């Protein structure tokens, strides 16, 4: 249920007070009464049955003639006007009931009739309710409607009387000649077919009926004139269009239909601020808005409110045609109901191509048309000569397959206007450049933001070869770079989901029936044809919605929409042509203040300057605004806040080591400021360290000291020149003489003692954490030292460093879920690599005997203290080695990296109190078999020969989960991960893993069922792994085939079959040892930090 709006201006539309339903109830009662009058007027039987209650009502409460079609119509119109909350209807009903009440009171006094007294009391209560409910009848009628209605009534009665007199003269019956005119006047004006004793005869019977009908028509016309709602002129003024164009320029980049708001046979209403507007047209009492509001989304609610207020003033039902999801949400918040109307077809030109099975029909059509010598020409309207544009207009009219131009929310309704120079014309030309050049098709598209177009007009010469439209659309998409277009909005498919889902096997009976109905009406309205013409291009579908006030209004809204879109054509009676090229509005809707302040133009051209309400970025906190004001002051004073480089002479660390009296120039970030009046102390930091800067008025003067204090804020980048000395307390300081701003910091720094305390903020603002947190700097320095050590150590061993592809067609080299991406140039899905292994092995086949790579890999897995979706890996391969040789090298690499970071073979680990403590990792490290480590934990014998049943029992006893489809290798490895890996502390090598779990590893040379593979684990984290690589191409093919079957079965981590790798392996690879190490985890091990702390920019959660 919709909650009432907070804005009081909308309150009356949503008010649920005790009198809010009076208009509806009174209209309902009189509507039922009018039906009864109509029925007993045409049915003598019903008139006889209801005679007693009819006469009672007629005598005391409300006129109820026995035969009066005109009265039935009048009451029906009054009922409709009351239900529409028209104030004039309230006046008529209240006065009418007041007159009857006075008559009853008089009769009560004179005749003492109790029925008159009861009726008077009842009517007084009714009148009291009507008076109390007067504010609910707020709808206006047209200005001067009462006088116009009186004129229509008198004129209509006069004409009807003259016609009736003629009929009486033709068919007089026994009526005397001198009474015939009076008879006609009586019957027309009384509007009742009853006898009158004044006359001495009667004309023919049917004459009475005709005369009564003529009177009813005159009365009906008068009442309709009185109750008719205010009419909209459905037109823009030049200033209105100018303001709309300004809004589109600044806020219309995301709305494909925004430019259609400049269509000139619409009216417009603006938000009071002028920041947003709604264009609309009124048809049969429905105020039909087209698409989303134009302008600043923050002002949309105010524009919608103004639009609803306008509609409520004149009794219009409100509806919206073709709103986007964003727009529909805004209208729904304003109280409208929302129904998905269909979908808009959007082509992303960078993704469009004619390849693939789905595009075969379009590809064939394009090829067929090209054989006829048809080419495509694209021009902006501004580049088209006037004579060519005149020919375009003629062709558009001649080739139109309907009598009138269709479209309202998604059509511009004009061609050749000088203000539409950014529109795009796409022409299919036969024999281009020759004397026989002939245009056989054309598309006209309006601008959609800076890099899109939206289809306005589509024409095809009746004799053109089939496929001309497909050629134009495909050429527009594939040659879009020539015109700077990246997105194209095609036609709108009404009820697309019905056509799509209803034609599928298994569609329900209701859906099939609904589709059949739409297909039937498609004979006239091309509903299915629009869907078929769009779906062939494989577009993205963007939903469009119909918004409306009440379900009871849906039929009228649908009919009004059909009129507006041109599907239903009403008789002209002076209606304007759909090709509106001039401004016909007489009253500007744009707020008057904007006309002068924004430089609007009466010819509809865009404003001279950007509107003053355009946004210049996010709303700034007060402290940021203060700093930005300082930035502006610096600019006014001619001081460059972001100057060109002037390198310092010393780093801060070097300056601090310089002898006292040394002249230096340092640069860094201002972290602390302490102002003691005549002297200011500041702390400045660069990457090498911190130093205190002393600014003394005795050295620089009071004025410069004041300038320094006023100019600089915490966080600013500063360059200071001076001499090394000491403060009065003997603290080493740089005695400042000169300074300049190197960069103004526009945001305040965090607390100088706590820094960034929130972990997510530290990740999101990593640059700030590094600038303020010495530990973060130390970790990055340690990481750099570790990576450099790994690279230097391998280089010293004769390894060559290479780079292999990150984008790969097949994901392999490890069991992990990959990230998927797409290359538009080849219309090909690609993976971000999960490992460089298979490419490095190709190089081993090529003869590279020692090769390594340090690079990024990507795995679509969880994020925690030891996992990040992207991380750095080291992989190294050495011919004529094995996993034991890789074990020695791995240990030596890590020990050398520890020396590079700390100068000794130590690592840092958190102690019991959370403080980091040193751990010696020199010498040999423990080596255990995987099965032996599991057996050690369980206290029972576990080996590669242990049966599947025994392993399952051990898992059940120790609450280790497993799947019934797993083999012994998978279960044994699951036990290892639960019992061993998580509880390992000191670096340990675990060897001889199950062969079934190692698809790229050589089987053990002497132990069946296991492979020559080890994992290095420390403090619950796997640091690296190494194999004796599998070089048998036949065995390797069998294993990867098995993996590909798992992948096909839905295992996201199983490797795919890489035929190129297998073909390379079939050329023979020497016996090789392979090593893989997680560089981030090695840094974690050495520094004692988490994986997030060791990365410069770890992945952060999305902003809320």
UniProtKB/Swiss-Prot annotation:
Family affiliation: In the N-terminal section; belongs to the LPG synthetase family.
Catalysed reactions, as listed in the record: tRNA(Lys) + L-lysine + ATP = L-lysyl-tRNA(Lys) + AMP + diphosphate; L-lysyl-tRNA(Lys) + a 1,2-diacyl-sn-glycero-3-phospho-(1'-sn-glycerol) = a 1,2-diacyl-sn-glycero-3-phospho-1'-(3'-O-L-lysyl)-sn-glycerol + tRNA(Lys)
Transmembrane segments: 25-45, 64-84, 90-110, 117-137, 151-171, 205-225
An example molecular function term from Gene Ontology annotations: lysine-tRNA ligase activity
UniProt membrane topology term: Multi-pass membrane protein
Its job: Catalyzes the production of L-lysyl-tRNA(Lys)transfer and the transfer of a lysyl group from L-lysyl-tRNA(Lys) to membrane-bound phosphatidylglycerol (PG), which produces lysylphosphatidylglycerol (LPG), one of the components of the bacterial membrane with a positive net charge. LPG synthesis contributes to the resistance to cationic antimicrobial peptides (CAMPs) and likely protects M.tuberculosis against the CAMPs produced by competiting microorganisms (bacteriocins).
Gene Ontology BP terms: lipid metabolic process; lysyl-tRNA aminoacylation; response to antibiotic
Sequence positions that bind Mg(2+) 1: 1015, 1022
Major localization class: membrane
Region annotated Lysine--tRNA ligase, chain positions: 609-1104
SUPFAM superfamilies: Class II aaRS and biotin synthetases (SSF55681), Nucleic acid-binding proteins (SSF50249)
Localisation: Cell membrane
Entry keyword annotation includes Lyase: no
Residues holding Mg(2+) 2: 1022
Keyword field contains Electron transport: no
Native source species: Rhodococcus erythropolis (strain PR4 / NBRC 100887)
Top-level lineage group: Bacteria
Entry's Gene Ontology cellular component terms: cytosol; plasma membrane
The EC number(s) this enzyme carries: 6.1.1.6, 2.3.2.3
Protein name per the record: Lysylphosphatidylglycerol biosynthesis bifunctional protein LysX
Residue segments, region Disordered: 600-621
Keywords: Aminoacyl-tRNA synthetase, Antibiotic resistance, ATP-binding, Cell membrane, DNA-binding, Ligase, Lipid metabolism, Magnesium, Membrane, Metal-binding, Multifunctional enzyme, Nucleotide-binding, Transferase, Transmembrane, Transmembrane helix
Region annotation (Phosphatidylglycerol lysyltransferase) ranges: 1-608
HAMAP family, alphabetized: Lys_tRNA_synth_class2 (MF_00252)
Annotation: DNA-binding region: 664-739
Needed cofactors: Mg(2+)
């Amino acid at each position: 249920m919709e909650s009432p709006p907070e804005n009081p201006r909308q309150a009356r539309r949503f008010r649920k007070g005790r009198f809010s339903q009076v208009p509806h109830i009174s209209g309902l009662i009189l509507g039922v009464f009018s039906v009864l009058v109509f029925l007993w007027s045409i049915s003598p039987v019903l008139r006889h049955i209801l005679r007693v209650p009819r006469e009672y009502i007629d005598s005391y409460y409300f006129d109820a003639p026995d035969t009066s079609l005109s009265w039935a119509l009048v009451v029906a119109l009054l009922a409709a006007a009351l239900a529409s909350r028209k104030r004039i209807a309230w006046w008529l009903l209240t006065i009418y009931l007041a007159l009857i009440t006075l008559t009853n009171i008089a009769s009560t006094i004179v005749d003492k009739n109790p029925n008159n007294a009861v009726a008077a009391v009842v009517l007084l209560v009714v009148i009291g309710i009507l008076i109390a409910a007067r504010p609910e009848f707020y709808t206006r009628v047209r200005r001067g409607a009462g006088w116009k209605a009186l004129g229509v009534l008198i004129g209509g009665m006069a004409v009807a009387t003259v016609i009736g007199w003629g009929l009486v003269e033709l068919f007089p019956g026994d009526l005397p000649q001198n009474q015939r005119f009076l008879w006609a006047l009586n019957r027309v004006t009384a509007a009742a077919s009853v006898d009158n004793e004044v006359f001495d005869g009667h004309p023919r019977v049917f004459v009475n009926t005709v005369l009564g009908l003529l009177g009813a028509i005159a009365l009906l016309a008068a009442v309709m004139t009185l109750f008719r709602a205010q009419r909209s002129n459905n037109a823009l003024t030049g200033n209105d269009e100018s303001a709309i164009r300004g809004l589109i320029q600044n806020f219309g980049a995301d709305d494909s239909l925004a430019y259609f708001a400049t269509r000139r046979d619409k009216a417009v209403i603006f938000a009071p601020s002028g920041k947003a507007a709604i264009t609309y047209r009124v048809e049969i009492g429905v105020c039909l808005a087209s698409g989303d509001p134009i302008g600043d989304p923050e002002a949309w609610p105010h524009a919608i409110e103004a639009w609803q207020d306008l509609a409520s003033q004149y009794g219009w039902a409100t509806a919206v045609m073709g709103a986007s999801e964003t727009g529909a949400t805004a209208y729904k918040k304003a109280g409208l109901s929302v129904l998905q109307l269909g979908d808009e077809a959007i082509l992303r030109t960078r993704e469009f191509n004619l390849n693939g099975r789905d595009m075969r029909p379009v590809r064939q059509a394009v090829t067929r048309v090209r054989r006829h010598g048809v080419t495509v020409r694209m021009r902006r309207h501004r580049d088209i000569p006037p004579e060519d544009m005149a020919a375009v207009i003629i062709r558009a009219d001649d080739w139109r397959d309907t009598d009138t131009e269709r479209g309202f929310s998604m059509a511009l309704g004009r061609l050749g206007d000088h203000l539409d120079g950014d529109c795009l014309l796409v022409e299919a030309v036969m024999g281009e450049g020759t004397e026989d050049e002939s245009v056989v098709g054309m598309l006209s598209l309006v601008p959609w933001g800076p890099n899109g177009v939206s289809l306005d007009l589509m024409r095809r010469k009746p004799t053109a070869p089939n496929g001309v439209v497909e050629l134009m659309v495909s050429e527009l998409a594939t040659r879009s770079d020539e015109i700077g277009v990246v997105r194209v909005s095609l036609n709108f498919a009404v009820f697309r989901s019905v056509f799509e889902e209803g034609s599928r096997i298994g569609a329900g009976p209701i859906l099939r029936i609904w589709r059949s109905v739409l297909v039937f009406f498609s004979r006239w309205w091309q509903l299915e044809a629009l869907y078929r013409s769009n779906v062939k291009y494989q577009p993205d579908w963007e939903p469009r919605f119909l918004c409306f006030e009440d379900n009871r209004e849906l039929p009228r809204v649908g009919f009004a929409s059909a009129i507006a879109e041109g599907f239903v054509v009403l008789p002209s009676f002076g209606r304007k042509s759909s090709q509106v090229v001039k401004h016909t509005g007489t009253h500007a809707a744009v707020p008057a203040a904007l006309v002068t302040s924004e430089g609007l133009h009466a010819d509809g051209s865009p404003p001279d300057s950007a509107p003053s309400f355009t946004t210049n970025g996010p709303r700034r906190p007060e402290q940021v605004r203060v700093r930005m004001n300082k930035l502006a002051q610096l600019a006014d004073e001619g001081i460059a806040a972001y100057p060109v480089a002037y390198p310092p002479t010393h780093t801060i660390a070097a300056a601090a080591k310089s002898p006292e009296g040394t002249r230096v120039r340092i640069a860094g970030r201002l972290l602390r400021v302490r102002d003691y009046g005549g002297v200011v102390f500041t702390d400045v930091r660069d990457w090498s360290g911190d130093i205190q800067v002393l600014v003394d008025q005795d050295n620089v003067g009071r004025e410069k000291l004041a300038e320094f204090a006023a100019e600089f804020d915490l966080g600013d980048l500063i360059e200071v020149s001076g001499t090394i000395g000491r403060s009065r307390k003997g603290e080493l300081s740089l005695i400042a003489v000169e300074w300049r701003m190197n960069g103004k910091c526009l945001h305040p720094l965090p607390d100088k003692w706590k820094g960034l305390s929130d972990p997510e903020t530290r990740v999101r603002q990593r640059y700030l954490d590094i600038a303020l947190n010495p530990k973060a700097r130390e970790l990055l320095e340690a990481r750099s030292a570790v990576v450099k050590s790994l690279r230097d150590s391998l280089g010293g061993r004769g390894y060559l460093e290479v780079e292999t592809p990150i984008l790969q067609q097949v994901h392999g080299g490890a069991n992990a879920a990959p990230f998927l991406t797409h290359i538009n140039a080849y219309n090909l899905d690609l993976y971000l690599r999960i490992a460089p292994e298979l490419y490095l092995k190709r190089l081993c086949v090529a003869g590279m005997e020692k090769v390594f790579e340090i690079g990024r890999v990507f795995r679509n897995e969880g994020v925690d203290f030891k996992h990040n979706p992207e991380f750095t890996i080291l992989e190294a391969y050495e011919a004529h080695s094995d996993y034991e040789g890789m074990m020695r090298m791995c240990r030596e690499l890590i020990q050398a990296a520890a020396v590079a970071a700390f100068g000794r073979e130590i690592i840092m680990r958190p102690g019991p109190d959370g403080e980091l403590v040193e751990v010696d990792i020199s010498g040999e490290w423990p080596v255990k078999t995987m099965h032996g480590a599991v057996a050690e934990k369980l206290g029972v014998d576990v080996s590669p020969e242990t049966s599947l049943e025994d392993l399952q029992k051990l898992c059940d006893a120790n609450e280790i989960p497993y799947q019934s489809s797993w083999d012994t290798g998978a279960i044994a490895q699951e036990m290892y991960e639960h019992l061993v890996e998580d509880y390992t502390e000191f670096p340990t090598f675990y060897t001889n893993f199950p062969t079934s779990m190692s698809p790229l590893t050589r089987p053990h040379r002497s132990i069946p069922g296991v492979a020559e593979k080890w994992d290095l684990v420390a403090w619950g984290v796997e640091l690296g792994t190494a194999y004796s690589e599998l070089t048998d191409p036949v065995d390797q093919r069998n294993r990867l085939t098995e993996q590909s079957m798992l992948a096909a079965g839905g295992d996201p981590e199983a490797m795919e079959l890489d035929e190129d790798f297998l073909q390379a392996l079939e050329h023979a690879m020497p016996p090789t040892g392979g090593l893989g190490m997680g560089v981030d985890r090695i840094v974690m091990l050495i520094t004692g930090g988490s994986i997030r702390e060791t990365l410069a920019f770890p992945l952060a959660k999305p902003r809320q």
